[in-house]
Amino acid sequence: MAEIAAEKGLLDDPIILDKLGEARALCEAARLLTYKVIDIRAKGLSPSADTQIARVAGTNADLAIGNLALEILGPEAMEYGSFADANFRLAMTAGVAVGATEVQLNLIAARFLGLPKE
């Protein structure tokens, strides 16, 4: 997305820069959390709340990239089959594919934070 923003001359916009940074941070967090879950599973340990945290992080990263693509690309993002279209469709289904985000957050609250179930 940064390359596309640069091509469109949007890197002077502080709001775009902020959103690019946020999206990158969300992607990096999702990547690291996913590696942590893979490591836990590779060691033969039981799944932990880290699994739900990684799922929520991945969903948040997908949504951030999808929304950013729509903002940077403007109307061309709506072209069927474009990068932005494909990414946004992935982002919209990501939360459902890994379990509703609300369910994941409830599992995190109960398992990781020790909060009562809703």
Task: Locate the predicted segments by residue.
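Alpha-helical interface subdomain recognition
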Residues: M1-E118
